C-alpha cells in the first residue's frame, strides 16, 4: 500500500468517497454536508487526512490510522478538544465540522510514585 496524504475509510465506502483536490472549477460542485474532512495528528506531528461520512463510527478511522502508523488500537487514544473519542461515536454525535482535528496520543499507564520517608 502506498502512502498518500489522505486515507479512505473502507472499500465499501469508496463509492461515496471523493478525493480532495481543491478544484472547484466544476459547475455541479455543491457543498456536501454528508461528508467531512478530518485531520488526525500524531505526537510526531504527522498528519493523516480522512474524508468520512458524519454517520461513520470512529472505529473505522481509528483502525486505518493505527494500521498506517504500525500501532495497535490499544496503544493510542484519540482526542477531540482534549476529550477521548470512543470507537462507537460518530462525527455527527460530537458536532464535528469540516476541517476539525483529532489528536492521536500514546496511551500512558501507571503513574505510581515511590514515597520516600
From Swiss-Prot:
Cross-link Glycyl lysine isopeptide (Gly-Lys) (interchain with K-? in acceptor proteins) - where?
111
Chief localization class?
Answer: nucleus
GO:BP terms for this protein?
mitotic recombination-dependent replication fork processing; protein sumoylation; stalled replication fork localization to nuclear periphery; telomere maintenance
Where in the cell does this protein reside? Nucleus
Domain Ubiquitin-like per the UniProt entry, residue ranges: 35-115
Protein name from the UniProt record:
Ubiquitin-like protein pmt3/smt3
Would the keyword Nucleus be found if you checked this record's keyword annotation? yes
Among the entry's GO cellular component annotations, what is one? mitotic spindle pole body
Q: What does this protein do?
A: Required for chromosome segregation where it may be involved in microtubule assembly. Loss of smt3 leads to an increase in telomere length.
Which residues comprise the propeptide?
Answer: 112-117
Return the similarity comment: Belongs to the ubiquitin family. SUMO subfamily.
GO MF terms here are: protein tag activity; ubiquitin-like protein ligase binding
